[in-house]
Amino acid sequence: MSKRDYYEVLGVGRDASEREIKKAYKRLAMKFHPDRNPGDKAAEASFKEAKEAYEILTDTDKKAAYDQFGHAGVDPNRGGGYGGGQGDFGDIFGDVFGDIFGGGRRGGQRQAARGSDLRYNLELSLEEAVKGLTKELRIPTLATCDLCDGSGAKKGTSASTCTTCHGQGQVQMRQGFFTVQQPCPTCHGRGKIIKDPCSKCHGDGRVEKSKTLSVKIPAGVDTGDRIRLAGEGEAGEFGAPPGDLYVQVSVREHAIFVRDGNNLYCEVPISFSKAALGGEIEVPTLDGKVSLKIPAETQTGRMFRLRGKGVKSVRSHAVGDLLCKVVMETPVNLNDRQKELLREFEATLTGESKKHSPKAEGFFDGVKKFFQDLNS
């Protein structure tokens, strides 16, 4: 008899998350569990089928092999697919003997799992990142069920001792000449069975819920920084500790400033006359406009440093600088009078290029020499 597709068994799509797979399995396990269906062979078969599907689809390597090769990829009796290559021996023996010998434990119940860590991607403006602020974040998570207080059992009831392992969480099995232990297949190592599950969480002890957190973002954070909020992740299983929440920061590009560490860069346009004669211009900073003195004969591309006008370091008391690059703009949309004045000005420079434009004169002298050498 051919096996059913594992995704079909659990009633989930192929793009289902691990949480969705786990939720589907728990629903089926509750429905077909042998303790709830004594003597029902069909229910027992359905329970085993769901358990097998769950174990494959929650194991990263086995799931990848199954997705690629189907059942052949996870069948240890066939070559190719999963287990057919030269994998890591530590992983292979850990997978095989971990189940046989109880995962290295000397008996005892499986400990309830700690809650999963969560990640929240937070995008900030440059101003928010530089100055810091408090953000209200809405986090979807798994929270402890308030109806059963996380026990998973119906209110007024409690989990009962597993009749298969008698509360030990482990069972002994004969393997050739050896007697070995493995997690109890009935209670999955917990030692207890929930016969009357909570109507709200359906025996999981946790429910999907959104919570709002006020998170203080320190001044000076940058793209790639991560803020850890201990205990704000998903609730743990049956009273186990919760996971943590990690807020991953990214900073949007700014229309004026470019950030490099604690320094800021910007380009400031200046007129031809201002560059030649000098004067004062207004430049933007994150704290408002400031005056910058431009000396006469300033060339385009010159960099001016405004100390302490950058970003305060999030890890020290150091403060970066603002570096302003002045870029001379060529005047446009000139009227006839303005064009005439420029021609008059140009005429006054004739024969004095070395005096007024030494770089240009040197450049053209170099070009002239290049062609002379080329033709000699």
UniProtKB/Swiss-Prot annotation:
Q: Cofactors per UniProt?
A: Zn(2+)
What biological function has been recorded for the protein in this entry?
Answer: Participates actively in the response to hyperosmotic and heat shock by preventing the aggregation of stress-denatured proteins and by disaggregating proteins, also in an autonomous, DnaK-independent fashion. Unfolded proteins bind initially to DnaJ; upon interaction with the DnaJ-bound protein, DnaK hydrolyzes its bound ATP, resulting in the formation of a stable complex. GrpE releases ADP from DnaK; ATP binding to DnaK triggers the release of the substrate protein, thus completing the reaction cycle.
Quote the record's binding site residues for Zn(2+) 1.
C145, C148, C198, C201
| One annotated Gene Ontology cellular component of this protein | cytoplasm
BP-aspect Gene Ontology terms: chaperone cofactor-dependent protein refolding; DNA replication; protein refolding; response to heat
Q: Name one GO molecular function term.
A: zinc ion binding
Q: Which residue windows are coiled coil? A: none
Lineage, top ranks: Bacteria, Pseudomonadati, Pseudomonadota, Gammaproteobacteria, Alteromonadales
Q: What is this protein called?
A: Chaperone protein DnaJ
Q: State the CXXCXGXG motif repeat positions.
A: 145-152, 162-169, 184-191, 198-205
Task: Relay the domain remarks.
Answer: The J domain is necessary and sufficient to stimulate DnaK ATPase activity. Zinc center 1 plays an important role in the autonomous, DnaK-independent chaperone activity of DnaJ. Zinc center 2 is essential for interaction with DnaK and for DnaJ activity.
Q: Which residues form the J domain?
A: 5-70
What does the subunit comment say?
A: Homodimer.
Q: What UniProt keywords are attached to this protein's entry?
A: Chaperone, Cytoplasm, DNA replication, Metal-binding, Repeat, Stress response, Zinc, Zinc-finger
Q: Does the keyword Cell membrane apply?
A: no
NCBIfam families given in the database record: DnaJ_bact, PRK10767.1
The family this protein is said to belong to: Belongs to the DnaJ family.
Entry's localization field: Cytoplasm
Paste the cofactor note.
Binds 2 Zn(2+) ions per monomer.
Report the domain of life of the source organism: Bacteria
> Is the keyword Flavoprotein assigned to this protein?
no
CR-type zinc finger locations on the chain? 132-210
Gene name in the database record: dnaJ
Record's InterPro entries? DnaJ (IPR012724), DnaJ_C (IPR002939), DnaJ_domain (IPR001623), DnaJ_domain_CS (IPR018253), HSP40/DnaJ_pept-bd (IPR008971), HSP_DnaJ_Cys-rich_dom (IPR001305), HSP_DnaJ_Cys-rich_dom_sf (IPR036410), J_dom_sf (IPR036869)
Q: Which residues bind Zn(2+) 2?
A: C162, C165, C184, C187
Q: Please name the SMART domains in this protein's record.
A: DnaJ
